[in-house]
UniProtKB/Swiss-Prot annotation:
This is Large ribosomal subunit protein bL25. Keywords: Ribonucleoprotein, Ribosomal protein, RNA-binding, rRNA-binding. It holds the Pfam family Ribosomal_L25p. One of its GO terms (biological process) is translation. The keyword tRNA-binding does not apply. One of its GO terms (molecular function) is 5S rRNA binding. It comes from Haemophilus influenzae (strain PittEE). InterPro entries: Rbsml_bL25/Gln-tRNA_synth_N, Ribosomal_bL25/Gln-tRNA_synth, Ribosomal_bL25_short, Ribosomal_L25_dom, Ribosomal_uL5_bac-type. Belongs to the bacterial ribosomal protein bL25 family.
Length: 95
């Protein structure tokens, strides 16, 4: 199963900005690795929450569309809420 998500570059950093994103149904994330600089991004929570239910989400290469440019990544780390079925943050590594 191929996964493809639209992402926005995140400019506001910090705890307050991340909380505002989560309250609006979005997830802060980061893309790093390779020769490019790390990029902070914003993703839709519901899309990712549904996709992460599939086992292949963790092993396959995922395509992120960041500012019109496609980036191939793999999930490096995921942080989940302690008792709610919510994602808190995701780290992606360039494939």
């Amino acid at each position: 199963m191929a996964f493809k998500f639209n992402a926005e570059v995140r400019t506001a950093q910090g705890k307050g900005a991340s909380r505002r994103l989560r309250n609006n149904g979005q997830i802060p994330a980061i893309v790093y690795g390779g020769s490019e600089e790390p990029v902070s991004i914003i993703l839709n929570h519901d899309e990712l929450n549904n996709a992460q239910a599939h086992e292949s989400f963790y092993s396959e290469v995922i395509t992120l569309v960041i500012g019109g440019k496609e980036v191939a990544v793999k999930v490096q780390a995921m942080q989940r809420h302690p008792f709610k079925p919510k994602l808190v943050h995701i780290d992606f590594k360039r494939a």
